[in-house]
């Protein structure tokens, strides 16, 4: 049937002369000839180079018509053209058989050649939009298939069915897969995004497959704020029941790690659990208390230090300290996010006297400055567009260099001190040129904004105006999404620094609501944080139920997250009551106080994923679990020495001669942030009674510190 549709489509068009741009290039793209692993790679393949995904049709046309002395196109005997012989395996082809001589694709290319192999009108042949049917696939259970239909509209007013020439990809093939003809098969419960691409136009079709289980009844859970409203609306539609609310002890541990980076003390847990006032009110009050503590600034300084690459390797020791203190001051004063970013992007002068200028110590090259700024502050990855038009987004190579031009005059020179940098604007002209044709690229915003103009004498100020504008559709959204990921384990758009049409949000109304709230409160990050952690969604238990066990996308239950390196180190010290001495820092210092990754380098913190701060990507910090980490927890000195510390928690409890019950309870609260269950208490009491009480207590603490309950924030 699909073959017949394609034949019919070609026959209908046969009256009109075929052109490369409208009729042949789609075949090249569909067959993968222009893909990265094939001829669209940086160096092409087997001496034949095409533009990646056909972004430069004029280049590709010349490669076919004139390269190899025209051997790819045989004007007198078209059937002997390499462009036909290779993909049909008339001669050996490294890419294998792409189509046979009886296929519609072969016949269309042959007809085009016989008609003279015209390039065509690049304007009239431009695709202006795609009609995609269905626009959404939603099925009550796995099994049904759906056939896509894609109609392309062209600049000359014509349209055609391009279903069989369209490229399809499923983001989650385990949930739904799609064949070359656009037939979508639903495989199992879940959600996927069907990416539909045709000649530079892209559309995303959401695919939802329900579990197909009977007996679902929506529980109408209470809602603390608008977050819960948007989350619950989607859960109800997907027939997913959210988990129960976390216990007070679970909440206390979770929110403490998330807000201040360290666990609550046993005394704090006891007091919070004993408070019988309204749950929502007392939790909200605890959030306020934690955010007022100095550890709040310490913890979030670590996150911003990662993103802004605070490291003495790049900034020098004095520069790193200055930048670190500026970050701390910005967080402590709750500086509006837009103001903070503006100070970074427009910074000039000494990296010692004006700390935001350190931003350009690691982005001194204009292209790096542009790529880092857009990825960090807009969640947009422009790197692909440096060499070619972005294959999955609207950004072009020309736009890449126009945006880079805002940093064209910026430079960094040495200061009075050997490690000091001075950021300045060069007086002489420094042109950013397009690599394809050498054209000088004038600064131009990535998308138009009538409120702002490019001021030639204030290029970075002009960029900052546009970047931080309230109506910039990426700036506030990227930050709202990033902050959400810190508390929920993944972004609504994930990865958080890869916002594009082909990477849609898991809950678009929720992200829009968070963004609007952030804007309505004038880029107040603390308000955004409080809103998230006060939601019932954030406070749900990590324990799943019969209806949400498979869900890892819609926030129906908390996602356990491995503690960061700094959190884990500080949690070990808090649980054991030990004060380990590390080089360069005071005995009382926590890992969250460390300015850069050179403190205690090569030890526990690096093993558990502390980043070297070489990039501004969240991906540099590792939160995986490895065998080497497990062995360190089992046998490493950080754990064993802390447990056995003669001035640590266990030693002090033994000196007080507390009962076994109180000893076990204290160790559970210190390590896991909860009281032991009855069976755990019984087992621990029996173990303590079998030998040396001190050794048994250390064994118990060792077991707790090696459990998932300690390693993960859940």
List the model feature ranges, each with a label.
Residues 1-4:
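Positively charged n-region of N-terminal signal peptides that target proteins for export
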Residues 7-15:
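Hydrophobic h-region of N-terminal signal peptides that target proteins for export
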Residues 15-106, 123-151, 159-224, 252-254, ...:
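Solvent-exposed helix-loop boundary motif
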Residues 29-52, 114-122, 381-396, 539-540, ...:
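Periplasmic/extracellular electron-transfer cofactor-ligation site
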Residues 69-70, 94-99, 314, 558-559, ...:
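Active-site rim elements
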Residues 99-119, 628-635, 639, 643-644:
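Catalytic cores of secreted or luminal carbohydrate-active enzymes
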Residues 219-295, 303-583, 619-620, 640-697, ...:
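Primarily short, surface-exposed interaction patches in extracytoplasmic proteins
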Residues 576, 583-585, 590-598, 603-627, ...:
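Long, His/Glu/Asp-enriched segments that create or flank divalent metal/ion-associated functional microenvironments
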